[in-house]
């Protein structure tokens, strides 16, 4: 369970009640990484640990993926608080 949601790694479905959402591999990696650590992670940490990019690389990959994942979750589950951000860090509380 992740904040009241279930994640099936085999089917890649993220669900709560009767609602289910198909996730990509990267979306699953983001959720598992943010949930496992229980701390705020800045963009550089996510770039390095999920994408393997160096911290000094200029990219908006993390922000774009997190934005799209938040939107998918918000659109289906009406949950705008699943992935939180604070001072350039992302976390699941």
Question: Could you tell me what each predicted segment is?
Answer:
Residues 69:
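Signature for phosphate-centric chemistry
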Residues 18-23, 29-64, 73-76, 87:
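Positively charged, aromatic-enriched patches within helix-turn-helix-type DNA-binding elements
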Residues 1, 73-76, 80:
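Short, solvent-exposed secondary-structure boundary motifs
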Residues 79-93:
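A short linear beta-strand->loop->alpha-helix hinge motif most characteristic
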Residues 2-28, 32, 91-93:
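A structural micro-motif at secondary-structure boundaries
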